Regions:
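Terminal amphipathic helices with adjacent charged low-complexity linkers/tails
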Residues: 119-131, 142-166, 299-332
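Gly-rich Lys/Arg/Thr-decorated short loops/hinges at beta-loop-alpha junctions or inter-strand turns
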Residues: 33-44, 77, 176-187, 270-272, ...
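Non-heme iron-sulfur electron-transfer modules
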Residues: 9-37, 65-90, 108-130, 140-156, ...
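Non-catalytic alpha/beta scaffold blocks inside enzyme catalytic domains
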Residues: 242, 246-528, 578-582
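Catalytic P-loop NTP-binding/switch module of NTPases
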Residues: 145-219
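Long, low-complexity segments enriched in small/aliphatic residues
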Residues: 514-582
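Amphipathic alpha-helical
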Residues: 92-115, 226-227
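Single conserved hydrophobic/aromatic residue that forms the stacking wall/gate
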Residues: 1-11
Length: 582
């Protein structure tokens, strides 16, 4: 073997010498080598179009799945190129999925470039919290820093897609973080120890009447945090002045079906009529909107919207946006009433904007009564759907973190409380006048700005926790990294505060907390009544229903801290008409 290898090497060298002396010194390739200049597709997608093999997967995705026809092919033969029509940023909220689809690396992730190698990353399967859909994702960390978020296949929820915000808001986990307790002295924050802030909190709670204390849970808190927060108020402070709503939203929690997406995300494809009332699913639940488009493309499902919501990526019939129109439809005196009655599986999707109206209770009960009267509630179909926007909303409602007896928000705005305890709540709007505000959270945002004491907590990737998505499915988000500095897990902070106040923890460990929480959820489900007919007590007001949308790229504290989301917002032009409006 050694001899043959040696002889082979000798002959190779001889051939190389002959080629060097007598061979052709120019390439026989006569054609021009193909090279394509890089294309601008926005802050998320880096292009190396010379690699492109013209499979047109990206074009088909943009046209068929995302529903925004902004990619196409120009030229013929070897001159063919994939490009955006106007050489501008892609406008779809699902645009970055083309990175996963591209088989050759012509389209790659711009924010992730040169960050890490795949084999260097720790991979954790978890749940997204950028909206209430609960998309399944994989979080990749390098040295406990989140580097990227990728989709996991779950055919019942997000299929294989995730929104751009889900994928790229993760850099906000490294910015504006609260990493140590703070106390405000003379209008300035100073670092403190945990024992110091706990002692001050204990003193404040003991010197205030229990009726003068209130608490609010935020939109990204997991269920364990919400439950121990509720237990802290019920058992330690002995009051129920707590809520998870940052607005005057109507909620009837006597039945679970009154606040979840009952038809399920998968059920969208089975529906034969979809009626949107005060909802804009493209921005409130991007993945759910892709399902509605899929139902339209595959089944030609009819979509009606009370409001003109702009381009939803599928055609729809829009109405005048008046509550009087809702009233006449669900009193059965409109053509649309007959369409709903004749549909075998209608879907009524109610947005949060409707639930904030003065006549929300009247309209909600009217809609539900109409559907029950016409036998639309069956064993295998529930047509009533609430489109929640935030990851923690349904879980907080399941845990009973709300107060329907008092209007806590009005009392807060009237400055009737002495102590306000905020856990991840950054959406409250009130003029502070002497209240002592305790803020517990992961980022320095609106809540931290008005606080007197800051307790640094953990983000969703830094602690295990359960979230219930808009259709009522409980999913567990797993810990992928650690909180920075002296920050702690949220449930642990509340547990230690209770121990300082009562010399006794609320729960000995997290397993005991989870067990107690699930027992409570079972009891709640047993307590919820089965009501045959909903009573209508509230009065009707004819008013214009305006869809109140958050800024899509800045909808929560993590997104607001993300540099990538800032770039996306800056590159977002007025969305061009794609010819799909109703």
């Amino acid at each position: 073997r050694m001899m043959s290898r040696g002889l082979g090497d000798v002959y190779k060298r001889q051939l190389q010498d002959q080629s060097m002396f007598y061979g052709v010194d120019k390439s026989r390739f006569k054609e021009n080598k193909r090279a394509v200049p890089e294309k601008h597709m926005g802050p998320l997608i880096k292009t190396q179009m010379t690699r492109c093999i013209h499979c047109t997967r990206c074009v088909r995705f943009a046209t068929e799945v995302a529903g925004v026809s902004e990619l196409g092919a120009i030229g013929r033969g070897e001159d063919m190129q994939i490009t955006t029509y106007l050489e501008q940023s892609m406008q779809s909220e699902l645009s970055a999925n083309v990175i996963d689809l591209c088989p050759v690396g012509a389209l790659t992730s711009k924010p992730y470039v040169f960050e890490a190698r795949p084999w260097e990353l720790k991979k954790t399967e978890t749940v997204d919290v950028m909206d209430a859909v609960g998309s399944n994702v994989r979080v990749d960390t390098y040295d406990w820093e989140v580097k990227r978020v990728l989709p996991l296949i779950n055919e019942d929820i997000n299929e294989e897609w995730i929104s751009d915000k889900t994928r790229y808001a993760c850099d906000g986990l490294s910015n504006q973080r609260l990493d140590t307790p703070f106390i405000k002295y003379n209008g300035k924050f100073e670092k403190a120890s945990w024992s110091e802030v706990f002692k001050i909190n204990k003193s404040k709670f003991e010197n205030s009447s229990k009726d003068k204390v209130c608490g609010f849970v935020g939109d990204l808190t997991n269920m364990e945090t919400g439950y121990i927060f509720k237990e802290f108020f019920d058992r330690t402070l002995n009051n129920n002045n707590y809520d998870s709503r940052s607005d005057n939203r109507f909620l009837d929690n006597s039945e679970r079906e009154n606040y979840i997406f009952n038809s399920s995300i998968n059920g969208i494809e089975d529906a034969d009529l979809i009626f949107l009332i005060g909802a804009n699913p493209r921005y409130e639940a991007t993945i759910l909107n892709a399902r509605i488009r899929k139902a339209f493309v595959n089944n030609n499902t009819k979509v009606i919207s009370l409001n003109d919501s702009g381009d939803l990526t599928y055609p729809y019939k829009n109405l005048d946006g008046q509550t009087q129109t809702i009233k006449t439809i669900f009193e059965g005196s409109e053509e649309i009433s007959k369409e709903i009655i004749s549909a075998s599986k209608p879907m009524i999707i109610i947005g949060e904007s409707l639930l904030k109206l003065n006549s929300a209770e009247h309209l909600f009960n009217l809609i539900k009564n109409f559907l029950k009267k016409n036998n639309k509630f069956t064993e295998d179909w529930n047509p009533l759907n609430i489109l929640s926007c935030d990851a923690a909303t349904v879980g907080n409602f399941d845990l009973g973190i709300l107060n329907n007896e008092k209007n806590l928000l009005e009392e807060l705005k009237s400055n009737k409380f002495e102590i306000v305890y905020l856990v991840g709540q950054d959406n409250l709007e009130f003029n502070k006048k002497g209240e002592f505000v305790i803020y517990q959270g992961s980022h320095g945002d609106k809540g931290a700005e008005i606080a007197d004491i800051i307790l640094p907590g953990s983000a969703y990737t830094e602690q295990d926790g359960y979230f219930t998505n808009l259709e009522g499915k409980i999913q567990k988000a797993y810990k992928a990294s650690y909180p920075p500095g002296e920050a702690k897990e949220d449930w642990q902070i509340i547990n230690e505060l209770a121990e300082v106040m009562n010399n006794r923890k609320l729960f000995n460990d997290k397993e005991e907390l989870e067990s107690s929480m699930f027992n409570y959820l079972k009891l709640q489900q047993e307590k919820q009544k089965t009501v045959n007919k909903v009573k209508t007590n509230s009065e009707f007001q004819n008013e214009k229903l305006i869809i109140l949308l958050k800024d899509y790229y800045f909808s929560n504290v993590i997104a607001r801290s993300s540099k990538t989301m800032i770039e996306c917002n800056n590159s977002k032009l007025n969305i061009k008409s794609t010819g799909t409006e109703g």
